[in-house]
Each structure stands twice: as C-alpha cells, then as structure tokens.
Amino acid sequence: SEIVINELADDDWRGRIIGIYGSAGAAGFALGPLVLIMTGTDGLLPFVVTAILVAVAGLPLFWLRNEAVTDGHDSHPSLMRIFRLVPDIMLLNLAYAAAVEAFLAFFPLFGIHIGLTEARSLSLLATFALGGVVLQLPLGWLADRMRRYTLLLVCVVTTMLGFLLLPHIVSLKASGPAFTFVLGGMEGMIYALGVILLGQRFRGVDLAAASVLFTGMWGAGTMLGPALVGAGMDLLGDQSMPYLIAAIYAVYLPIFFIARRT
C-alpha cells in the first residue's frame, strides 16, 4: 500500500496524503486497547472481535483495480545500493519500530510499577495512539510547507525528550493523557516522514525496493526493541522503560547528522 500511495502521490501533496495514511494506521493502534477495554483480556472474545475487524478491513480490496505504476531505470535494484543512498531513513525505521514496539509491550508493566490500574494503562495507550491519528494530519500538512528533514529532526528530538519526561508526567490525572496524546502524534510522524522521504527520493522499482527494505527494517526493529528494552528493564528495573526507549533515539541521532553531512 505504501508503494502505490507514494508512487501516485504528487510531491506537493505527499505530506498530507501520507499523513492521512499514517492516521489510518494509528487509528488501528488506538482501536486495539479500546477493544480490550470493552471485551476484557480474558477468554476468546477479544480474538473474535479482532478477527472480525481484520475481515471487515479487507472488504474494500474486492473493489480495487489493478493499476500499473511507472518503472524505474533499474529493473533489478540492489537493496544494498538503496541502503547506501538513504541509511538514515532505513535506520530511522529500525529505531522507530524498536521504540514503539517496546513501548506498547512494556507500558502496562511500567504502569503497574508506578501505580496505574490496568484500565488506566490501556486508556493511556489508546490516547497515545489517538495522538498519532489526529496529529499526523496537521504535521503532514507541515511536511509540505517546510524542509522535511528539519521536521524529522524536530519529531525525533521531541519524542526522545518526551520519553525522558514520561515518568514524571504520565501518572498526573489531567496532564498525563494530554502528554501521551502529543507524544503519540510526534512519534507516529517519525514513521510517516520516513515514508514521505522515500517517496521524495525514489520512483518505480527503486521505490518498491526501498519500501521493501524499509519494511524489513521495521520487522527487525520489532524484534530487537522489546528484546533489548526488556533486558534493560531486567537489569535496571521496570521504571527504566521510558529512559531505555529514549536511548534508542539518542543512538540514532548521530546517524542522522552523519548522513546529512555526506
């Protein structure tokens, strides 16, 4: 889906279009905790509801037409060549996936450690995802109005600082949900900007190859993030979760600056 959307999107509108796409994806993340709040976490009901939602989401595919996209110059692009062209974007998705998957996996455990109830933790996760739904639309518009790499840097730094502040704010009754809402929007835009920048740089089969590699980085991040953060929490305690996630983005930042200089 990202390949086709990126190929067909005009660059002047790319930020807004990918913002809508990202909001739709974030809506799915927001829906998950809400389903658990309504169904509970015991028994088969949450699995049945999830299966129904997946089936409903697939229905529009029956009405899609088979549209060809333009070809690139190389019919057999090298993934290594693609990586060398945009290592910062590929490693961005690795870092993003590692961070967001670790957060989703361990936030309930972190919440218990700081005294949150299960329902409160799930509602904050839903609020975090809702921020990705709502804020990617204005941030996507902003991506069409300013330098996209600058906006990416702002999102990464803001997200890193947000996780450093999370333990001090998240348990507050009013500001906690507002904080997680903004944090979810800023972090969600990191992924969207990665997709936008790939579409800005590549076309045709090169875009397809870049998107495949980008997705592969996501998969690697989803495996590495929870494993590394979980190991860190075993050593440092459950309260270390947000600091370990912030460290993931801190490790990425030098890669961003080195790539921008070359």
Name the predicted role of every residue range.
Residues A51-D71, I255-A259:
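C-terminal membrane-cytosol helix-exit motif in multi-pass small-molecule transporters
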Residues Y21-F62:
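Helix-loop-helix hairpin linking two adjacent transmembrane segments in secondary transporters
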Residues M38-I52, A231-Y249:
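A membrane-interface helix-boundary motif in multi-pass transporters
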Residues S1-A9, M189-F202:
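Intracellular juxtamembrane helix-capping segments at the cytosolic ends
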Residues G40, L135-R147, M233-D234:
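Helix-to-loop junctions at the C-terminal end of transmembrane segments
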